[in-house]
Amino acid sequence: MIENFNDNFREICLNLKIDKRRFILGLSGGIDSMALLSLLKHFIVSNKNLKIEVFPVIIDHDLRLNSSNEAKAVQNIALSLGFNTIIKKIITKKPNGNIQNWARKERRRILCDIAFEFSANLILGHHSDDLVETIFMRSVKGSGIEGLRGMQDRMIWNDTLILRPLIFFKKRQIINYVNSNNVIFFEDQSNFLLKFERTRVRKTLKRISVSNWPSISNDIIKFSLLNKQLLLKINKI
């Protein structure tokens, strides 16, 4: 996985004409972002000539009693790897409903603001399973072509370039990497609560895959790529 990641990230840096070599990393402490932190460390060491700077930013949503302690523990791990790390605590009033959607929007807003302040790009740890879940949720809600394209490996949002170098990797690949390299991470128990839509969708996709459609994830990814190609053609008209 390290070699594939290096090839992917090097292509992003060199072939996509990215001028900035400074990156803000959204670091939650979960398995995906901690794997990405480890991979970035390896990439930086292996490509010193690129002079890459990465600044992890930990968003403390203040939704759990131990969130501050966990954020500090994640910061200490990042510091031990040589990364200057920032903790930002969300102090705005929490909504009564759809807390996950609120947290996602607040997190992205804060990260993009920091990236703009640092004149940096933003790196997020989304993987292909996240992409599949997102497209599935949007399809149920009747989303159009652009929505059914799903998350992209690179996109512009509020003048900030957002990169997702793990978007073509499956969750099981990330788990294998973490286990093989003894990467420390923190499990957010809310990921298993059925009151959240994404958790329910994840379980539904697994049930469909096991019962009668084992290729559903790959088929949804192909569907995403087809929508991306269609949008490119439409935009040329």
Placement of each model-derived feature along the sequence:
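Flexible helical/loop "lid" subdomain adjacent to adenine-nucleotide binding pockets
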Residues: 121, 125-237
